[in-house]
């Protein structure tokens, strides 16, 4: 990734005032900037609202120049861009440093969605080197709303090298992005301080940063699939569920792949997601609401490359902040490390560590893993699984360090699984078996077999 883009993502808040000052007049208007003429942008310019129906629009931004969509207020969906009937909308740099800014766009009314961009009927959005700042939707998708039909092919929404900051869904879902029945690709992005607010009827308000869901009632129809790669979530909030991410589906599980790949080099290869919270319609952060993520009928894979680390949460925060909750399935793949520092006791789905390491940084923080499945089928009850028969060539490890951990349901370790308990640490399980390696000076207690 170009170093200028890295700088914009890491230092966006400090760069914003001087950046805006250089682009706008003292009154905040874009009067000093010429209107865009065509889609091949050679100089800073202000675009008008775009409306596409079944056709294509491709913007190309020259190095060092800005395409600006700002200050557009509408009482219909799509503050700056409206797409329908399989329209295709693309913004990309000609080389590396051309940038696009969507700022202070809004749509009013609880049924109007997409503060900056609205897309329906299988329209596609492809964006690179983009900043979304302070866009507001009266309904869903503070910055982007995208609805499709889960057709096979390329992603319906593709956003790379982007910053989403301070976007708001006022009476809906997806503070920054709301997508339904779509395939989504997000890479090298940053989501900071986005919010999803609820209505007075205490509905919606899910997905402080992103809400990715599927409501197709046909079980034979494929569910949606989202890839979130090398992307940071910080300070996002939801009055409902899923402070950073909310995901659910009506029939087949929605699929999400959260990855840190070999190319990620910031912070020594350590990506940190923290200070995300969800209230669950209450007065403060709730573990049951999923401060980081809430999984309904969904399957989430954390794929962390060798030598890379994804850290979710901070042990110095309240345990509800950056928590994971819900009933879906979590799978850890890739030989890198996943560190969970929040209180995840309201995650009751199953967890499988197939490769690499999962570290629990907070005591008694994953107690109820597997509860949903075990309640449904007590005779075939699985909670947390370390290692795999099918992936025998991999090495999987659960590291509890010196924490105290209790697992209400089965803890199962295969031959390629390792349980590390440091001195002072303790793991207690009500049932289970471990055919792999147990290391460290801590203690493992299995109440029954």
Language-model regions: role of each:
Residues 60, 68, 82, 90, ...:
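Extracellular beta-strand solenoid repeats
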Residues 57, 65-67, 86-87, 123, ...:
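Small-residue (G/S/T/A) turn/hinge positions that recur once per unit in extracellular repeat modules
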Residues 30-105, 298-310, 316-317, 323-324, ...:
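N-terminal segments that cap or nucleate solenoid repeat domains
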Residues 34-35, 62-71, 88-106, 124-136, ...:
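Right-handed parallel beta-helix
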Residues 48-58, 79-84, 115-120, 142-149, ...:
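Glycine-rich beta-solenoid repeat tracts in large extracellular/virion proteins
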Residues 59, 65-71, 87-89, 98-104, ...:
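Extracellular beta-helix/beta-solenoid repeat scaffolds
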Residues 1-29:
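Gram-negative bacterial Sec-dependent N-terminal signal peptides
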Residues 75, 107-108, 136-138, 151, ...:
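Surface-exposed loop/turn positions within long extracellular repeat scaffolds
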């Amino acid at each position: 990734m170009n170093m200028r883009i890295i700088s914009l993502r890491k230092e966006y808040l400090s760069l914003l005032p001087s950046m805006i000052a250089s682009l706008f007049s003292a009154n905040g208007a874009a009067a000093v900037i010429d209107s865009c003429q065509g889609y091949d942008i050679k100089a800073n310019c202000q675009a008008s609202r775009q409306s596409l129906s079944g056709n294509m629009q491709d913007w190309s931004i020259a190095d060092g120049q800005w395409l600006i969509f700002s200050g557009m207020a509408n009482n219909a969906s799509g503050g700056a861009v409206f797409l329908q009937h399989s329209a295709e909308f693309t913004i990309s740099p000609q080389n590396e440093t051309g940038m696009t800014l969507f700022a202070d766009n809004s749509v009013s009314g609880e049924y109007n969605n997409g503060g900056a961009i609205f897309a329906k009927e299988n329209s596609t959005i492809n964006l690179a080197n983009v900043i979304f700042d302070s866009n507001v939707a009266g309904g869903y998708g503070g910055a982007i709303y995208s609805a499709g039909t889960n057709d096979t092919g390329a992603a319906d929404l593709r956003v790379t090298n982007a910053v989403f900051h301070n976007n708001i869904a006022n009476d809906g879902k997806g503070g920054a992005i709301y997508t339904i029945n779509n395939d989504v690709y997000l890479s090298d992005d940053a989501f900071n301080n986005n919010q999803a607010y609820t209505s007075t009827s205490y509905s919606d308000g899910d997905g402080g940063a992103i809400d990715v869901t599927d409501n197709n009632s046909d079980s034979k129809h494929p569910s949606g699939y989202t890839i979130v790669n090398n992307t940071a979530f910080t300070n996002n909030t939801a009055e409902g569920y899923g402070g950073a991410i909310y995901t659910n589906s009506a029939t087949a599980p929605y699929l999400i792949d959260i990855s840190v790949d070999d190319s990620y080099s910031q912070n020594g290869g350590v990506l940190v997601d923290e200070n995300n919270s969800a209230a669950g319609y209450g007065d403060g952060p709730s573990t049951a609401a999923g401060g980081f993520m809430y999984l309904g009928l969904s399957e989430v894979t954390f794929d962390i490359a060798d030598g890379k680390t994804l850290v979710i949460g901070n042990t110095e925060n309240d345990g509800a902040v950056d928590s994971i909750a819900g009933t879906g399935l979590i799978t850890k793949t890739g030989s890198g490390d996943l560190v969970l520092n929040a209180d995840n006791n309201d995650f009751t789905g199953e967890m499988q560590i197939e490769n690499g390491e999962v570290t629990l940084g907070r005591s008694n923080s994953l107690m109820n893993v597997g509860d949903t499945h075990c309640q449904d089928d007590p005779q075939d009850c699985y909670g947390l699984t370390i290692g795999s028969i099918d992936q025998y060539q991999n090495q999987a490890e659960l590291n509890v360090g010196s924490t105290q951990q209790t697992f209400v349901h089965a803890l199962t370790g295969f031959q390629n699984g390792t349980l590390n308990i440091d001195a002072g640490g303790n793991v207690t399980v009500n049932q289970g078996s471990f055919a792999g390696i147990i290391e460290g000076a801590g203690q493992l207690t299995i109440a029954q077999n």
